[in-house]
Amino acid sequence: MKEWLDEIKWNSDGLVPAIAQDHKTGRVLMMAWMNRESLALTAAEQRAIYWSRSRGKLWRKGEESGHVQKLHEMRLDCDADVIILMVEQLGHIACHTGRESCFYRVFEDGQWKTVDPVLKDPDAIYNAGH
């Protein structure tokens, strides 16, 4: 039934890293973890659903913020141990900091520099609860 899930090399915790990329620009938006259930649900619902290690439960991206990731394509790398999700990022914000991407810092001159702006105040996104 779900033999395709057996092709994935899950880590010792039953997880696989998943990289979300903008399906139009190719920009890396974020990295999160998926388990068998979240990956199967992602395929079935055509939206990104991750496994929250800190909360120990499924995390439907956008369930609190409204910043849903609509799935356009899934890819598995050559070693079968990393997933790429090509997504449409609703609201153009993937990061809980209110930025387009979680990768908003660049290493320059021996330090990490913030180079991407906050598009929306996280307190406004999460009703001051994040």
From Swiss-Prot:
GO cellular-component term (any): cytoplasm
Principal localisation: cytoplasm
Alphabetical list of InterPro entries matching this protein: PRA-CH, PRib_AMP_CycHydrolase_dom, PRib_AMP_CycHydrolase_sf
Stored PANTHER family: HISTIDINE BIOSYNTHESIS BIFUNCTIONAL PROTEIN, HISTIDINE BIOSYNTHESIS BIFUNCTIONAL PROTEIN HIS7
Protein keywords: Amino-acid biosynthesis, Cytoplasm, Histidine biosynthesis, Hydrolase, Magnesium, Metal-binding, Zinc
Recorded GO MF terms: magnesium ion binding; phosphoribosyl-AMP cyclohydrolase activity; zinc ion binding
Gene: hisI
Location(s) in or outside the cell: Cytoplasm
NCBIfam families: PRK00051.1
Protein name per UniProt: Phosphoribosyl-AMP cyclohydrolase
Pathway as given in its UniProt record: Amino-acid biosynthesis; L-histidine biosynthesis; L-histidine from 5-phospho-alpha-D-ribose 1-diphosphate: step 3/9
